[in-house]
Amino acid sequence: QDLKFSANFKLPFKNGNKLKFGAKVVRKTKDKAVDFYEYSPLDEDAFMENSLKNTVDQSNKHFMPNSKYQTGIYASKEYTGALDLNNPALFEKEQVQEELAGNFEARETVSSGYVRFDSKITDRIELMSGLRIENTNLAYTGRTYDADEDITGKTERQRNSYINFLPSLLVKWNVNDDFKVRGSFTQTLSRPKYSALVPSVNIKRSDNEITIGNPELKPTTSYNFDLSADYYFRSIGLVSAGIFYKKIDDFIVDQVSTNYEYQGNVYTRFTQPKNTGNANLLGVELSYQRDFGFIAPALKCIGFYGTYTYTHSRVEDFNFEGRENEEGLSMPGSPAHTANASLYFEKAGLNIRVSYNFASDFIDEMGESTFYDRYYDKVNYMDANASYTFGKKIKTTFYAEANNLLNQPL
């Protein structure tokens, strides 16, 4: 449930200058309350006999893996849908405690105010400057779960609050009607996920593993510097190049430790999200978009869009027990190379598009040493979609799509 209240004001001045200011309050209530039950037939022999009489072959020869994966025989949906699971004369019902471990109650209130001034320095130079202040208040309740003893309990309510000042400065230089240069400095904020903040404790004693939440997580903040140049073609399209730098503080990573002591017990595997350190990112981005009408007018219905981004990242002040002195680490979740490309055809209501996406490998999860780090492999995705719209008074659209044409493992 989200409740939002906001007020915005604008004061115009001479020469096109404007002052904008306002306030906003957002209160979010997010509860996860899942009840999961297992049903066991009281007469297993009769249940098995009836199930085997109501089966259907779910194999589909048009399924992409073909003979590599055959679904096989399953109970029919008509049979399973008609089962009277809540009839105590037929089934025994038991709640699954493990599913309750993921339940939580979360309350988040963000109160913010901003002021922004838009000014025209000259006929070709525009300046936008502003400041946003956000006050965040959090309250979370999670669950504790002991997998071997099948016990679920409720944690104490955890609270946290913080204030952030987020300045911004943007400059746009209209060199001419077709060429524009932009520069900006901003400070941004990224709050932790609900699932990371919940003070939950999940223990699996048979494997001697424990996973806990972290209600003391700080938000990740970033100072951002961007400079870009865009050239717009007289026909539809543009080519642009940009450079960016980000100074990121308190980024969050799932830290995994082995033989870790927690509340008097030593666990073979201990997992918890933590603010792991700071990082510097430097990168360049190139993009191009244009239809092929400049080659021949008949090709105006065909176009291309592509972007490429290179990012170089380095971690500083690494806050991981046993790895504080490591150097040369890349920021988790930050691939060095990403690319997107799309070839499209648009004419007379027919739209066809083929898209390609690439991301190089990157660190996904960090362990107590490089040996335990987990990497996400490089990925190549290709998708295609087509639609056709016809009709004047009543428009009708047919749409089709095909995903993961390169059969990239997910």
Mark where each language-model region is:
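Short loop/turn motifs that connect adjacent beta-strands in outer-membrane beta-barrel proteins
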Residues: 10-19, 34, 123-124, 178, ...
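Transmembrane beta-strands of outer-membrane beta-barrel pores
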Residues: 23-31, 133-139, 185-191, 200, ...
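Gram-negative outer-membrane beta-barrel transporters
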Residues: 5, 245-248, 257, 265-363
